[in-house]
Design a protein with these regions (language model features):
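Short, well-formed alpha-helical segments that are part of the catalytic scaffolds
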Residues: 11-28
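Acidic donor-binding/catalytic loop of UDP-sugar-dependent glycosyltransferases
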Residues: 48, 90-106
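Short beta-strand-to-loop element that shapes/binds the nucleotide-sugar donor at the catalytic cleft/hinge
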Residues: 112-126
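A recurrent flexible, glycine/aromatic-enriched loop bordering the glycosyltransferase active site
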Residues: 119, 134-152
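Acidic donor-binding loop at a coil-to-helix junction in glycosyltransferase catalytic cores
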Residues: 168-174
Length: 231
C-alpha cells in the first residue's frame, strides 16, 4: 500500500484541489492497481478543512501540535500502522500531476525528491513564479528538498527515525539523515508539483517565507538600480 500524507492547518481554500489531484494520481494505470490511502493531519484547524475532506471521503485525524514536522510524523505513523510500504508527502496547498505516485515507485530508490513550481493565476503570482524560476534548480540531480514533492520507503523511513517535530525544515532534516545512512535518493526533475504563490504561510521559515524573501530581494535590487541610475 502507498500512503500519502498531507499536513493541514486551516487550508479550506486549497485542500479540495489538492485532494482531487491526489485521488486522480491514485488511479494512475502505472500503479497497476496498487492500493493508495490518503491521510490528512488536521493540525489545529478552525475552518472548514475537515468538512471538505469528509466530502471527498478522505481520512483525517486531529492534532493540536501547530507544527508541520509533528503533523507529517503523525500522519506517517498512522499510514505505517495501516501497512504502507511507501510514504508520499505533499502540502495542502499543492497540486500533484496524475503520474506523481507512479513516478515515485518507478524511481526504484529509497527516497524520491522532486521539484515544485509556483501556481500563476494572476499578475502577482506570475511575477512570483518568474522570480522563483530564476532561483530554482531544475532537472535530474537538482539537490532540492520539498515536502510537497517527497517520497520515501517505509523501511528507510523507519531506519532513520522518521520526520522530526520541527516547525520548519523537517523535510530537509529527513533527507539529510537518509543520505547520511546511505539511502539511495532519486533527485528527479519530473513530475513537478505545483504549489500556491501565497506569501503568508503556515510555517515560519517555510516556502511562503522563501517566496516573500525573493520578492524583497527583487525590490531591494530595483531600489539600488534607481538610486545608482543603472536600472
Amino acid at each position: 500500500m502507498i500512503g500519502v500524507l498531507v499536513p493541514a492547518h486551516d487550508e479550506a481554500a486549497t485542500i479540495g484541489r489538492c485532494l482531487r489531484s491526489l485521488q486522480k494520481a491514485a488511479r494512475h494505470p502505472g500503479l497497476n492497481g496498487c492500493e493508495v490511502r490518503i491521510v490528512v493531519a488536521l493540525d489545529a484547524c478552525s475552518d472548514s478543512t475537515a468538512a471538505i475532506c469528509r466530502e471527498l471521503q478522505v481520512e483525517t485525524f486531529d492534532l493540536q501540535a501547530r507544527c508541520v514536522g509533528a503533523a507529517r510524523a503523525a500522519a506517517a505513523a498512522r499510514l505505517l500502522q495501516q501497512g504502507a510500504r511507501w510514504l508520499a508527502s505533499t502540502d495542502a496547498d499543492g497540486t500533484v500531476p496524475p503520474q506523481w505516485l507512479a513516478a515515485q515507485l518507478d524511481a526504484r530508490s529509497d527516497a524520491f525528491c522532486g521539484v515544485v513550481d509556483v501556481a500563476a493565476s494572476g499578475r502577482r503570482s506570475r511575477h512570483l513564479r518568474r522570480l522563483f524560476r530564476r532561483s530554482e534548480r531544475w532537472g535530474d540531480g537538482h539537490g532540492r528538498v520539498h515536502g510537497a514533492n517527497l517520497g520515501v520507503s517505509a523501511q528507510a523511513y523507519r531506519a532513520v527515525g522518521g520526520f522530526a517535530a520541527l516547525g520548519c525544515g523537517e523535510d530537509v532534516d529527513l533527507v539529510r539523515r537518509l543520505s547520511a545512512a546511505g539511502a539511495s535518493v532519486r533527485w528527479a526533475g519530473a513530475p513537478v508539483v505545483t504549489t500556491s504563490a501565497r506569501l503568508l504561510g503556515r510555517a515560519r521559515g517555510g516556502f511562503a517565507d522563501y517566496l516573500a524573501g525573493l520578492t524583497l530581494e527583487q525590490q531591494s535590487a530595483s531600489a539600488v538600480c534607481q538610486l545608482t541610475g543603472t536600472g
